[in-house]
C-alpha cells in the first residue's frame, strides 16, 4: 500500500512541480540537467516499485524489513524533492513581493536570481546523491528477498486479494461466524421480496453497504431459508470477489450441475447456464460483485422467462454496481449500521464468556463508538476481548488507546484488518488514496463540508479542478469515495449533492494509523508524540501546544494546518511557516487580529478559513497572490477590504460582509477588474443596502457563477438602481455562450422587493432562492431559461403565484416555505419535469394533486407537524416515488397511514421523519454543536413487520443543513435508486437565505427497501 502511494506520488506530482519551477525561474543549463537526471532516476525507481507490486501478493507471507526500509528511503527522497521545489517557489514568491530596495530593481533582481540558482543547484546535487544511494541500497539488499512487501498491515494486504474459497453459504467462514443481531426488519423484507408474486419475471435484489455491515450474512439467511423451503427448482451461491466473470460463471455452472466442469469461455458458459435454468424457477446469490462490467458479463447467463418468478440476490460494497444490478425490475437495499442497543448486545455476546453472563458488564461506550455499529467490528473486537480474558482482562478503554497496534498485529482482528486494507488498496491510483488519508486531518465525529474538503484537495495538489483535462478532478474523487461507501453522507442538499460527510469508526482508525505511519498527517492531540518533520498538522483536544512540546520540530515544511481548540503561541507563530497551502483556523479559540500580519506573508497559501475573534482583514491580504479560497463565515469580519477582489487566483469568497462607498473611487483593484482578470466564481455573499460601491465592481466579474446577496434597508436607501443593474447583468442570458450552472440567492429584510420586479429578459439561472414578501411571482422568474431549482420563502403564497409556478416546465426541484398556502390544485399539465417537491408549512394547507400530475416525482417532502393522515394525496399515482419525508411531530396514526401507503406502493418508498432542533438566527451557527444536538435528540420510529411500533435509537440516520453552502443545479437524474436520505431541512430553514438555521434529524420508517426504477 505504501509503495503504491509513493509510486503514484512520484508519477503524478513530481513532473508538475518541475514544470512549475521551469515556468517560474530562468534556470541555468546545469541546473536543468540535474533536474532531468532526477526525473529519469525517479522514473526508474517507480518502475522498480511497480514491478515489485505486480508480484502476486500470495508470495508475500510476511513483511520484509528490507523492503520497508527501501520504502522509507524513497518516501524521504520524494518528500525531499517536493520540499526542494516548494522551497524554491517560496523564495521566488517572496522576492517578487518585496517592493523596495536601495539597489536598482534590475540589479537586485539579477543578484537574487543568481543566489536562487546557486541554492537550487546545491539542493539538486544533494538530492541526486540521495537517489543514487537509495538505488544502490535497494540493489544491494533486495536481491535476497524478492517479492517481499514490507508495509503497514502487510500480511493483511498479502491476503486481501486471495479469493474466498468456492463455497456455499453454509461453509463460507464469514457467514458461519456471523451473528445476526438487529436485522429482523431487513430479513423480513428481504424474504417478502423473494416471496412476492409480482412481478413474475426475473427480479434482482441488490444489497449494498460498507464492508462488514452484514450484507453476506443477510443474504445467507435468506438463501438458507429458501433452499429449505423448496419453492425454487434450482439454487446456487457463488462468491464473485477477486474473480473474473468467466471464473464466476464456471463456479455457478458447477453449483447448478455438478456434472459440468465449467472450463469453457465466458460466452459458452452463459449458454450452458441458460440451458440449465431455462423454464425453471431459480434462486441465485452472487456475493461481493465488484464492477459493473463483471455484472454485465454475468447477467446474460440468466433466462428472463415470464410467469416463473426467479430471483437473484447480489451483494456489493459499490453503489453504482448495485444500481446497475437492479436497474430493471429490481430492488436496492442499503444496509444500515446497528443502533446502540443492538451494538451493545452483539459486543457483549461475543466478548463476555457465558460464565460471566450475570456479571456486571464493564463500560463499553468508548469501544462501541469506535465500532460505530459495524457488525464485523463488533464481532472481531468482542472476540479479541474474550480471548484476552474480558471482563477481568484488558478493558475497553485500554483497547481503544492501543487499537492501532492491535489492528495491525493481533490475529483475532485479522478479518477486520483485511476489510480495511481491501478498501484502501482497491482505490485506483495514488490521488484517491491521498484524498482518503486527508480525512485524518479532522477529529472523530466531525462533520466535514464537501466543498471545503474539495478546495483543500485542490490546494494540496492531490486533484485537478473540474474544468481541467485531468482524468481525476476533485468532484470525481469525492464521488468515488462515496460510491464505494468508504465515507458516508450526513447532510444532502436539494439536488442530492452531499453537503457534509464523515468516515466510519473503524475506517477512521485505519486512516489515522496509515496517515501517521506514512508521515502524511501529524496529530497533536492530548500531548501525543510529534515527528521531526511535519507536513500536515492537525491539532485537536484539550492540550495547548507550547514551545516545549515543539522542541526540534520544523514547521517550515507544513503544507496544511488545522486547529480545533487552542493552538498556543508556538503554532500560531506564522513566521515559522514557509510552504503552507491550507490554513483552517475556523475553530481556533486563541486566534486574533494580530496573527493576520504574518498570515499575509504566507505567499504559497491557497486556502484560508478564519474564525475565532478575527474582526478585520488587513490590506496586506493583497500579498496572498496564490489564494484561491477565502472563508470568513465563522469570523466577525463585517467589512471586506477591496484589495481582496484584486487577488488574481481567488475563486471562492465566503462570508457576510459589506464594502465602503470608497470602492466607487478609481483604484488599482478596479483597474485590475476592468481588464477581465478576476477569476472569482463564488461570492456568497455580501450585504447591500442598494448604495454600496461593490455593485460597481460586480460588472467586471465575468466568471461569477454563484451569488448570494442580503438586501437590507437603511436610512436613505431608497434607490436600488445599482442592485437591479448588478443582478440584471449577472442573470443576462448569453445564448451563444456555454453558461453552465449559475445560482442566485436573494434575501430581502425590511426592504422592498421592487428591485427585482423590473428585471427583464432574456435571463438565465439554473438555481434561484428568494426570501421576502411576494404577493406575486416576480415576472423575470417565469422567463428564466435553464431554471431547474427554485426555493421560495414568504409568509403566504397566493393562488396566482402558485399557478404561475406550475408553468415552469423545466423545473426539477421546488421548495416552498410559508405559514400557509392559498387553495391550489396541481394539475396534470403542471410541473411536468418535477423530481422533488418540498413544502414547509405552519398550517396544513397542502395543495390538491390531480391524478396523473407530477409523473416523474421521486421525492415528496411534506413538513408540517399538523399534517393529518394522507391529506388526500394518493402516492400510488407517483410511479417513480422513492422517498417521503414528514415532520417528526405528526401523530402516530398519521405515521402509520403513510407507512401503510408506502408498503402498498409498487416501489416501497422510504418514509423518513425530520426532527428539528432550533438554533439562534445567525449566519455563523456552530455546525458541530448543532450536530451534537441532533445526535442526542434523534430517534427512529420503526414499524416492524407484523408487530407493534418500536422506538429505536437512531444516531446513524440524520440530516443537518446548516445553510453554509448552497447547492448547485440538479443536472440530471440518472436513476432513482441512489437516494441516501432526505434532502432538506424543516420549518423556515431555507438554504442560504439567511433564515433561522434549523438542524433536522432524519429518522426512517423502514417499511421496505429502496427501489431502483428507470
From Swiss-Prot:
One of its GO terms (biological process) is defense response to other organism. Transmembrane segments: none annotated. Probable disease resistance protein. Resistance proteins guard the plant against pathogens that contain an appropriate avirulence protein via an indirect interaction with this avirulence protein. That triggers a defense system including the hypersensitive response, which restricts the pathogen growth. At the opposite of cultivars Aichi asahi and Sasanishiki, the cultivars Nipponbare, Mokoto and Hitomebore don't recognize the effector avirulence protein AVR-Pia from M.oryzae. InterPro entries: Apaf_helical, Disease_R_plants, LRR_dom_sf, LRR_R13L4/SHOC2-like, NB-ARC, P-loop_NTPase, Rx_N, WH-like_DNA-bd_sf. Belongs to the disease resistance NB-LRR family. Residues 1-182 are annotated as: Structured coiled coil (CC) domain. It comes from Oryza sativa subsp. japonica. This is Disease resistance protein RGA4. Pfam families: LRR_14, NB-ARC, Rx_N, WH_DRP. One of its GO terms (molecular function) is ATP binding. Residues 105-145 form a coiled coil.
Amino acid at each position: 500500500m505504501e509503495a503504491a502511494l509513493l509510486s503514484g506520488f512520484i508519477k503524478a506530482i513530481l513532473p508538475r512541480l518541475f514544470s512549475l519551477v521551469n515556468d517560474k525561474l530562468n534556470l541555468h543549463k546545469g541546473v536543468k540537467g540535474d533536474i532531468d537526471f532526477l526525473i529519469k532516476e525517479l522514473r526508474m525507481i517507480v518502475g522498480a516499485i511497480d514491478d515489485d507490486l505486480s508480484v502476486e501478493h500470495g508470495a508475500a507471507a510476511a513483511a520484509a524489513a528490507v523492503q520497508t526500509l527501501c520504502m522509507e528511503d524513497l518516501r524521504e527522497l520524494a518528500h525531499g524533492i517536493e520540499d526542494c521545489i516548494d522551497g524554491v517557489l517560496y523564495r521566488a514568491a517572496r522576492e517578487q513581493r518585496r517592493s523596495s530596495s536601495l539597489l536598482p530593481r534590475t540589479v537586485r533582481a539579477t543578484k537574487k536570481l543568481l543566489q536562487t540558482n546557486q541554492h537550487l543547484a546545491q539542493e539538486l546535487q544533494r538530492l541526486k546523491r540521495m537517489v543514487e544511494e537509495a538505488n544502490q541500497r535497494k540493489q544491494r539488499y533486495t536481491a535476497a528477498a524478492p517479492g517481499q512487501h514490507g508495509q503497514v498491515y502487510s500480511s493483511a494486504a498479502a491476503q486481501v486479494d486471495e479469493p474466498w474459497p468456492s463455497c456455499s453459504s453454509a461453509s463460507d467462514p464469514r457467514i458461519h461466524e456471523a451473528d445476526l443481531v438487529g436485522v429482523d426488519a431487513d430479513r423480513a423484507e428481504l424474504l417478502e421480496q423473494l416471496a412476492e408474486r409480482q412481478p413474475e419475471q426475473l427480479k434482482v435484489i441488490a444489497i449494498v453497504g460498507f464492508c462488514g455491515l452484514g450484507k453476506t450474512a443477510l443474504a445467507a439467511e435468506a438463501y438458507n431459508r429458501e433452499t429449505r423451503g423448496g419453492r425454487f427448482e434450482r439454487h446456487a451461491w457463488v462468491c464473485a470477489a477477486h474473480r473474473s466473470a468467466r471464473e464466476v460463471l464456471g463456479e455457478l455452472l458447477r453449483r447448478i450441475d455438478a456434472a459440468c466442469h465449467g472450463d469453457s469461455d465466458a460466452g459458452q458458459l452463459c449458454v450452458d447456464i441458460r440451458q440449465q435454468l431455462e423454464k425453471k424457477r431459480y434462486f441465485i446469490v452472487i456475493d461481493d460483485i465488484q464492477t459493473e462490467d463483471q455484472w454485465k458479463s454475468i447477467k446474460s447467463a440468466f433466462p428472463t422467462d415470464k410467469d416463473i418468478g426467479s430471483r437473484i440476490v447480489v451483494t456489493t460494497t459499490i453503489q453504482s454496481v448495485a444500481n446497475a444490478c437492479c436497474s430493471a425490475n429490481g430492488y436496492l437495499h442499503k444496509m444500515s449500521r446497528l443502533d446502540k442497543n443492538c451494538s451493545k448486545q452483539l459486543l457483549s455476546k461475543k466478548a463476555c464468556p457465558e460464565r460471566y453472563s450475570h456479571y456486571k458488564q464493564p463500560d463499553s461506550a468508548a469501544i462501541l463508538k469506535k465500532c460505530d455499529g459495524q457488525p464485523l467490528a463488533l464481532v472481531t473486537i468482542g472476540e479479541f476481548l474474550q480471548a484476552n480474558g474480558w471482563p477481568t482482562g484488558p478493558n475497553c478503554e485500554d483497547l481503544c488507546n492501543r487499537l492501532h497496534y492491535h489492528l495491525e498485529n493481533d490475529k483475532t482482528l485479522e478479518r477486520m484488518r483485511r476489510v480495511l486494507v481491501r478498501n484502501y488498496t482497491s482505490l485506483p491510483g495514488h490521488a484517491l488514496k491521498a484524498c482518503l488519508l486527508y480525512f485524518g486531518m479532522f477529529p472523530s465525529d466531525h462533520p466535514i463540508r464537501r466543498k471545503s474538503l474539495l478546495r483543500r484537495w485542490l490546494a494540496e495538489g492531490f486533484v485537478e479542478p473540474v474544468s481541467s483535462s485531468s482524468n481525476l478532478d476533485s468532484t470525481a474523487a469525492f464521488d468515488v469515495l462515496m460510491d464505494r461507501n468508504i465515507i458516508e453522507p450526513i447532510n444532502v442538499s436539494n439536488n442530492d449533492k452531499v453537503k457534509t460527510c464523515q468516515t466510519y469508526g473503524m475506517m477512521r482508525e485505519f486512516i489515522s494509523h496509515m496517515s501517521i505511519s506514512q508521515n502524511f498527517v501529524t496529530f497533536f492531540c492530548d500531548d501525543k508524540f510529534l515527528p521531526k518533520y511535519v507536513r500536515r498538522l492537525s491539532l485537536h483536544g484539550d492540550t495547548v501546544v507550547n514551545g516545549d512540546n515543539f522542541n526540534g520540530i520544523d514547521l517550515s515544511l507544513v503544507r496544511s494546518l488545522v486547529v480545533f481548540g487552542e493552538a498556543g503561541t508556538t503554532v500560531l507563530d506564522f513566521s515559522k511557516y514557509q510552504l503552507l497551502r491550507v490554513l483552517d483556523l475556523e475553530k481556533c479559540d486563541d486566534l486574533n487580529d494580530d496573527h493576520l500580519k504574518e498570515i499575509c506573508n504566507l505567499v504559497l497559501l491557497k486556502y484560508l478559513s478564519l474564525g475565532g475573534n478575527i474582526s478585520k482583514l488587513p490590506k496586506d491580504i493583497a500579498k496572498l497572490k496564490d489564494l484561491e479560497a477565502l472563508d470568513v463565515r465563522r469570523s466577525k469580519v463585517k467589512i471586506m477590504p477591496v484589495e481582496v477582489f484584486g487577488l488574481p487566483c481567488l475563486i471562492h469568497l465566503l462570508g457576510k460582509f459589506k464594502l465602503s462607498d470608497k470602492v466607487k473611487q478609481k483604484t488599482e483593484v478596479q483597474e485590475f477588474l476592468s481588464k477581465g482578470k478576476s477569476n472569482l466564481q463564488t461570492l456568497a455573499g455580501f450585504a447591500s443596502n442598494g448604495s454600496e460601491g461593490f455593485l460597481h465592481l460586480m460588472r467586471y466579474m465575468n466568471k461569477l457563477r454563484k451569488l448570494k446577496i442580503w438586501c437590507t434597508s437603511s436610512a436613505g436607501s431608497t434607490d436600488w438602481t445599482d442592485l437591479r443593474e448588478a443582478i440584471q447583468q449577472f442573470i443576462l442570458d448569453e445564448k451563444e455562450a456555454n453558461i453552465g450552472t449559475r445560482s442566485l440567492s436573494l434575501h430581502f429584510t425590511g426592504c422592498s422587493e421592487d428591485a427585482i420586479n423590473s428585471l427583464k429578459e432574456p435571463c438565465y439561472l439554473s438555481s434561484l432562492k428568494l426570501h421576502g414578501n411576494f404577493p406575486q411571482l416576480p415576472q423575470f422568474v417565469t422567463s428564466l431559461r435553464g431554471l431547474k431549482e427554485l426555493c421560495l420563502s414568504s409568509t403566504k403564497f397566493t393562488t396566482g403565484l402558485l399557478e404561475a409556478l406550475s408553468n415552469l416546465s423545466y423545473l426539477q426541484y421546488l421548495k416552498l416555505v410559508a405559514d400557509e398556502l392559498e387553495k391550489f390544485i396541481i394539475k396534470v399539465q403542471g410541473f411536468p419535469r418535477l423530481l422533488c417537491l418540498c413544502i414547509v408549512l405552519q398550517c396544513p394547507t397542502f395543495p390538491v394533486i390531480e391524478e396523473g400530475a407530477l409523473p416523474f416525482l421521486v421525492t415528496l417532502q411534506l413538513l408540517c407537524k399538523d399534517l393529518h393522515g394522507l391529506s388526500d394525496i394518493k402516492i400510488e399515482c407517483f410511479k417513480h416515488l422513492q422517498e417521503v419525508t414528514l415532520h417528526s411531530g405528526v401523530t402516530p396514526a398519521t405515521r402509520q397511514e403513510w407507512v401503510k401507503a408506502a408498503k402498498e406502493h409498487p416501489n416501497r418508498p422510504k418514509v423518513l421523519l425530520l426532527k428539528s432542533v432550533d438554533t439562534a438566527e445567525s449566519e455563523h451557527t456552530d455546525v458541530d454543536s448543532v450536530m451534537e444536538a441532533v445526535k442526542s435528540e434523534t430517534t427512529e420510529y420503526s414499524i416492524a413487520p407484523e408487530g407493534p411500533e418500536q422506538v429505536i435509537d437512531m444516531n446513524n440516520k440524520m440530516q443537518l443543513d446548516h445553510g453554509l453552502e448552497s447547492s448547485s443545479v440538479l443536472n440530471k437524474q440518472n436513476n432513482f435508486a441512489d437516494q441516501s436520505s432526505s434532502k432538506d431541512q424543516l420549518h423556515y430553514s431555507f438554504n442560504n437565505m439567511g433564515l433561522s438555521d434549523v438542524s433536522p434529524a432524519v429518522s426512517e420508517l423502514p417499511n421496505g427497501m429502496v427501489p431502483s426504477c428507470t
